[in-house]
A protein has these predicted regions:
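Active-site helix-initiating loop/hinge in glycosyltransferases
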Residues: 56-58, 64, 153
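Short acidic alpha-helix that forms the nucleotide-activated donor recognition element
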Residues: 128-141
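Catalytic binding pocket for nucleotide-activated donors in carbohydrate/polymer assembly enzymes
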Residues: 70-82, 138-190
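Conserved donor-binding loops in enzymes that form glycosidic bonds
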Residues: 50-52, 86, 126, 190
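Carbohydrate-associated surface elements
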Residues: 14
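Nucleotide-sugar donor-binding and catalytic loop/hinge architecture
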Residues: 2-5, 23-46, 73-76
Length: 190
């Protein structure tokens, strides 16, 4: 253009790896991981962290968790699912409806599968610091990132970055997340 060369390339967004992994060296991250391991009583923990948004497929995710426990009732004692969904756009009716629906679905799953000493689903409608999320990711052996359609989902990359290389967890990732193009080691689902 006008005697100049122009090159256009795609550069997928990433996380600040050094900054994020530095969070893992904090006392807050270590304490969060220890609290989670203690509170889950060494059950396999699966985590989803998504802002409260219709594109994230959160109702469908809870439907999948419900079907899993219905088909595998013996696994209720082995698995705990933790969904962290910080509120977003709280003044919009459709987002209020999603929150109410998630609370209802989590309650139905827990009502059907809880016992006096365990609750299979923990739904948390609050934000957490990067250090707390690092600790939570480290404590969870399964990361679940299953948006209906998404751009470059950074949570998937944060989950992978928080894993212990000697004993990493598994990332279950929607093929409709932009991160699926880069995270070839993830278990891709539709």
């Amino acid at each position: 253009i006008d005697g100049r060369s122009v090159i256009a390339k795609a550069y997928p967004i990433g996380i600040d790896f050094d900054h994020f992994t530095a969070q893992g060296r904090t006392g807050e991250a270590r304490q969060t991981a220890q609290r989670m391991l203690s509170s889950t009583r060494r059950r396999t923990a699966m985590i989803g962290v998504d802002r409260l948004d219709y594109s994230k497929g959160l109702p469908e995710r809870l439907d999948g968790i419900s079907r899993f426990f219905e088909r595998h009732p013996d696994r209720v004692r082995d698995l705990v699912f933790i969904q962290i969904a910080p509120p977003s756009r709280e003044d919009i009716d459709s987002y209020q409806q999603i929150r109410a629906l998630l609370e209802q679905k989590a309650g139905q799953i827990n009502g059907a599968h809880s016992s006096i000493d365990l609750v299979p689903v923990r739904y948390v409608n609050q934000g957490h610091s990067p250090a707390e999320l690092y600790g939570a990711f480290l404590a969870c052996k399964i990361g679940l990132v299953t948006p209906l359609r998404d751009g470059m989902n950074l949570v998937a990359k944060e989950y992978v970055a928080a894993q212990d290389p000697a004993d990493p967890g598994v990332l279950i990732l929607s093929r409709f997340a932009g991160a699926a193009q880069q995270l070839k080691g993830a278990l891709l689902v539709n």
